[in-house]
Amino acid sequence: MYHNSSQKRHWTFASEEQLARLRADANRKFKCKAVANGKVLPNDPLFLEPHEEMTLCKYYEKRLLEFCSVFKPAMPRSVVGTACMYFKRFYLNNSVMEYHPRIIMLTCAFLACKVDEFNVSSPQFVGNLRESPLGQEKALEQILEYELLLIQQLNFHLIVHNPYRPFEGFLIDIKTRYPMLENPEILRKTADDFLSRIALTDAYLLYTPSQIALTAILSSASRAGITMESYLSESLMLKENRTCLSQLLDIMKSMRNLVKKYEPPRSEEVAILKQKLERCHSSDLALNMVTKKRKGYEDDDYVSKKPKQEEEEWTDDDLVDAL
């Protein structure tokens, strides 16, 4: 399972600082490519800085979760979690200046539906966009064009271990082996809220699914005034391993701090950065050096020859019916 997975080996990182370095490196590499192309200067004011890219990623990740939350038919939580993880992984090594997060977020959701075997047709999927039939068709063409790129950038590691299954497992375990808590279901709603909030942070890239699930349950218990330390020491048999117990408590504290310090992007800042992003993707700046590179394919047969203006007619406002 998780401990033998590609997620543990390749997509679980040691620290927030390591994630920041990866994102800064992706930003730097794109700037170098754009400058080498001869179209822009090294200090061009339209370049986005790493912290600006992060703000845009936060915004589009939130849009991704909103899109999934109102999706029809209802999207399983595992699919939502997988889509969210794909998005996080993609922008660890790629810049929003090269690949627009609007289409990447939809491609992540589309691919997650396939991988998690959520049976929804392509027309059904784009039917959730607030667009004309022609606009939905264009959006689907873009999604299909970017799908292989996304798979490649994920290094073909498509199986995602979400915290939802261990979360249910812990609740069952508490019901059967922890009689001190009569009705563990009272923890569910607040724990679900915690899982929704932590999904917006980098926790999925730093901690194991079971650690996230357990933190959600114990945080919910704490908010309800219920002490569950004895569950860790007795039921999970950590009483004799004080070092392991101490490490687990430190991890849970770090996760709670991640949630506390998360700041949603301010709408005013996002509006400015979105304008900057659109200029990065405009044909006159030519930061997307080669059309087929922008599409992510090396074979000309895969590349859509549609002009840029037609391709980008749909906008963020077209993402969902009910936002």
Curated annotation (Swiss-Prot):
Q: Among its keywords, does the record have Phosphoprotein?
A: yes
What's an example of a GO molecular-function annotation for this chain? kinase activity
InterPro entries this protein is in?
Cyclin-like_dom (IPR013763), Cyclin-like_sf (IPR036915), Cyclin/Ssn8 (IPR043198), Cyclin_C_2 (IPR031658), Cyclin_N (IPR006671), CyclinH/Ccl1 (IPR027081)
**Skewed-composition ranges (Acidic residues):** 310-323
The answer to keyword Cell cycle applying to this record is: yes
Q: Name one GO biological process term.
A: transcription initiation at RNA polymerase II promoter
Per the record, residues carrying Phosphothreonine are T315
Which residues does the annotated region (Disordered) include? 296-323
Chief localization class? nucleus
Could you tell me what this protein does? Regulates CDK7, the catalytic subunit of the CDK-activating kinase (CAK) enzymatic complex. CAK activates the cyclin-associated kinases CDK1, CDK2, CDK4 and CDK6 by threonine phosphorylation. CAK complexed to the core-TFIIH basal transcription factor activates RNA polymerase II by serine phosphorylation of the repetitive C-terminal domain (CTD) of its large subunit (POLR2A), allowing its escape from the promoter and elongation of the transcripts. Involved in cell cycle control and in RNA transcription by RNA polymerase II. Its expression and activity are constant throughout the cell cycle.
What PANTHER family is this protein classified in?
A: CYCLIN
Query: What is annotated about its quaternary structure and interactions?
Result: Associates primarily with CDK7 and MAT1 to form the CAK complex. CAK can further associate with the core-TFIIH to form the TFIIH basal transcription factor.
Which family is this sequence assigned to?
Belongs to the cyclin family. Cyclin C subfamily.
Quote the protein name from its UniProt record. Cyclin-H
Q: Which organism is it from?
A: Rattus norvegicus (Rat)
Output the lineage of the source organism.
Answer: Eukaryota, Metazoa, Chordata, Craniata, Vertebrata
